[in-house]
Design a protein with these regions (language model features):
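Hydrophobic membrane-insertion alpha-helices, especially the h-region
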Residues: 8-23
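Short, glycine-/small- and polar/acidic-enriched structural segments
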Residues: 28-202, 218-224, 247
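Ligand-binding clefts/hinges and TM-proximal coupling segments of bilobed small-molecule sensing domains
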Residues: 36-39, 167-194, 273-311, 358
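Sec-exported extracytoplasmic/periplasmic mature domains
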Residues: 75-78, 106-107, 125, 152, ...
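Pocket-lining segment of extracytoplasmic ligand-binding domains
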Residues: 117-119, 193-301
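Secondary-structure end/capping motifs
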Residues: 263-353
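Periplasmic peptidoglycan-binding/tethering modules of Gram-negative envelope proteins
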Residues: 369-444, 501-507
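Periplasmic OmpA-like peptidoglycan-binding domain that tethers envelope proteins to the cell wall
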Residues: 450-507
Length: 507
C-alpha cells in the first residue's frame, strides 16, 4: 500500500512538474509575446495614422549597369519625369550579370531592366524561360564597339581564319556579339570557341593589348573610350566596328511579363518618362555623358566623349514607333533584329536552340508604344533619322583602290551546267545574301567569278565573268543598290566558285 502511494505521489509530482514547465516555458512567453505583438501593432497603427499617403503610386526595381548608353536613367530629368508620374524607380547596378538579371525578373525581384537583345536571348536560353518582354528600344551601337588588331599580324577579316588567332574579349558582352556576327557572316571556319579568351573587364582587355607585340595574332574587341586609346598606335587598325553593320548590338528596355500584366500603366508611365528625357537631352548628350562618367569616377576627355556619343544612336520616340512596327518606315523592324541575332547565336554555337522556337514576335510587346502614339504622345519635334543604303558610285580606279574587309560566308552558288543561269536552290541562297547585305550597308561588294584551269582558259574566264554578272543582276533586282556592287572575273585558280568580298574606299 505504501509503495502504491509513493508511485501515485510520484506521478502527480511529474504531472505538476510538466504543468509548471509548460506554464513557464510556453504559456508565460506566449502571453508576453501576445502583449508585445499587440504593442507593436498599436505602434505601427500610430505610425500609419500620423503619417501621410505616399506620393508614389508604384515602385519599380530596375536592373541595369554602368554603360554610358544608360546615362539617361541616372539623370535628374528622368527622375523628375518619374516623380511627376508618381513612379519611384530604384536603379540596381548588377555589374552586367545578365543571367541573374533575368532570374530577378523571373522571381519578382526586379520589375523592369535593360538588356542587349543578344543577352536577353542567351539568358532566356540559359534559364529555359521567357519571363521578360521588350517594350522599348534604348539605343544601337554605331561605332562604339570595335574589333582591333595589329596591321602586321591581322591585315583584314580574312586573316582571322587562323586557329592561332585569339579574341581577347569580355564574355556575354557587346564585344562577344560583335565577334560572333563576324564569325557568322565571314568565312572563318577555323575560328572556334577555343579562339575566345574571355577576361573579367575592359581594363583587362586593354592591359593585354598593352603587353602585346605587333606580331601577335591577337584581336582586341572592346568599346569606347578604349578603342580610341588603342587606335592612337599607328600599328593598330580597326578591323571592323559597329558603325559598319546594323541591328545586332541593340539595347532595349524589358518588363517582367508578370508585372506588365498586373500594372501596364506603370510600364507605360516609365516609357513616357524615359522618351521625354531622350528628347530633353537630344542636344546635350555630350554634357550628360561627361558628367555621368565623372560621377562614376571614370572621367573622359573631350575627344573620348565625342567618339563615345557619336558611337551610340539613342532612339527617340518616332524611331521607336518605326522599329516596333507601330508605323511603317524603312528602319529595321525589331522582329527582324531578333531573328537575325538568334541566327548568329545559333550558327556560332553560343546557344543550342532558339528559346522563342522560331517566333521572335513573342519577345517584344509593342502595344504600349502603339497606344501612346494613338494618344499623340510626342515629347517634341523629333526627326526620324535614317541611313542610306545607297553608297556613292565609284569609277574603275576607285573600285581598284577598295580596302578589302573580308570575304562573306555564302554557300556555293550553283549554275546550270555550262551556263550562267542560277539554279532555284541558289536563288534561296542569294535571297539570304540580300538580307545579309542589308545589315552591312556601309561596305561595297565585289562579286568575284573564278574559273576552271581545264580546257579553253579564255572561254572559262568569260563564263566566270558572266556568272558573276548574273549574280549581280539578281542582287540588283532584289533591292541592292547598283552603286555598291561590281562583278569581276579573277585570274583562274581552278575553282568555279563565285566569291563575295566586302570593301571600303579609304579616306
Amino acid at each position: 500500500m505504501k509503495s502504491k502511494l509513493i508511485v501515485v505521489s510520484f506521478i502527480w509530482l511529474v504531472i505538476l512538474f510538466v504543468f509548471a514547465a509548460a506554464w513557464k516555458l510556453w504559456w508565460v512567453p506566449s502571453q508576453e509575446e501576445a502583449v508585445e505583438q499587440a504593442a507593436q501593432e498599436a505602434h505601427e497603427e500610430a505610425i500609419r495614422q500620423t503619417g501621410s499617403a505616399s506620393k508614389y503610386r508604384t515602385q519599380i526595381n530596375f536592373a541595369y549597369d554602368s554603360f554610358s548608353g544608360y546615362s539617361i536613367f541616372r539623370s535628374e530629368n528622368f527622375k523628375n519625369n518619374l516623380s511627376q508620374k508618381s513612379l519611384k524607380v530604384n536603379l540596381v547596378d548588377d555589374g552586367a550579370n545578365y543571367i541573374e538579371r533575368l532570374k530577378g525578373l523571373q522571381s519578382g525581384k526586379y520589375q523592369m531592366a535593360a538588356f542587349t537583345i543578344d543577352a536577353l536571348i542567351k539568358a532566356s536560353d540559359e534559364i529555359g524561360d521567357l519571363p521578360a518582354t521588350i517594350v522599348e528600344i534604348i539605343d544601337e551601337s554605331r561605332g562604339c564597339d570595335a574589333m582591333t588588331g595589329y596591321k602586321l599580324a591581322i591585315p583584314d577579316l580574312d586573316a582571322l581564319n587562323d586557329p592561332e588567332v585569339k579574341f581577347i574579349l569580355i564574355e556575354n558582352s557587346p564585344a562577344e556579339t560583335l565577334s560572333r556576327v563576324v564569325m557568322s557572316h565571314f568565312g572563318l571556319n577555323n575560328v572556334s570557341e577555343k579562339s575566345f579568351i574571355p577576361v573579367a573587364n575592359a581594363e583587362e582587355v586593354y592591359r593585354r593589348y598593352r603587353e602585346s607585340k605587333p606580331s601577335d595574332k591577337f584581336v582586341f574587341v572592346l568599346w569606347e573610350p578604349y578603342v580610341t586609346k588603342m587606335l592612337e598606335n599607328p600599328n593598330v587598325h580597326d578591323l571592323v566596328n559597329s558603325s559598319r553593320f546594323r541591328g545586332y548590338i541593340v539595347d532595349v528596355i524589358v518588363a517582367s511579363r508578370d508585372f506588365l500584366v498586373k500594372d501596364e500603366q506603370a510600364v507605360r508611365d516609365f516609357i513616357e518618362a524615359y522618351l521625354s528625357s531622350v528628347y530633353h537631352y537630344r542636344n546635350t548628350m555630350e554634357s550628360l555623358v561627361a558628367s555621368d562618367a565623372k560621377e562614376a569616377g571614370t572621367p573622359l576627355n573631350d575627344e573620348q566623349i565625342k567618339r563615345l556619343v557619336k558611337g551610340i544612336w539613342w532612339k527617340n520616340t518616332v524611331e521607336n514607333y518605326a522599329h516596333m512596327g507601330v508605323e511603317s518606315h524603312s528602319l529595321q523592324h525589331i522582329e527582324d533584329m531578333i531573328a537575325n541575332i538568334t541566327k548568329v547565336l545559333i550558327s556560332t554555337g553560343s546557344i543550342s536552340s532558339d528559346p522563342a522556337n522560331g517566333q521572335p514576335n513573342i519577345l517584344y510587346y509593342n502595344k504600349i508604344l502603339s497606344d501612346i502614339k494613338n494618344n499623340n504622345f510626342f515629347p517634341g519635334k523629333e526627326n526620324l533619322r535614317t541611313e542610306s543604303d545607297v553608297l556613292p558610285s565609284l569609277n574603275d580606279e576607285e573600285w581598284s583602290k577598295l580596302t578589302p574587309v573580308g570575304t562573306l560566308k555564302v554557300p556555293k552558288i550553283v549554275f546550270a551546267r555550262g551556263t550562267s543561269k542560277v539554279t532555284s536552290q541558289s536563288e534561296i541562297t542569294l535571297n539570304e545574301l540580300v538580307e545579309k547585305l542589308k545589315t552591312w550597308p556601309q561596305y561595297y561588294l565585289v562579286i568575284k567569278g573564278d574559273a576552271s584551269l581545264r580546257g579553253d582558259i579564255e572561254a572559262n574566264k568569260a563564263l566566270a565573268l558572266e556568272r558573276a554578272k548574273s549574280v549581280e543582276r539578281y542582287l540588283l533586282n532584289h533591292g541592292i543598290s547598283s552603286t555598291r556592287v561590281k562583278a569581276v572575273a579573277v585570274e583562274p585558280t581552278g575553282s568555279t566558285d563565285v566569291m563575295f568580298q566586302l570593301g571600303y574606299l579609304p579616306y
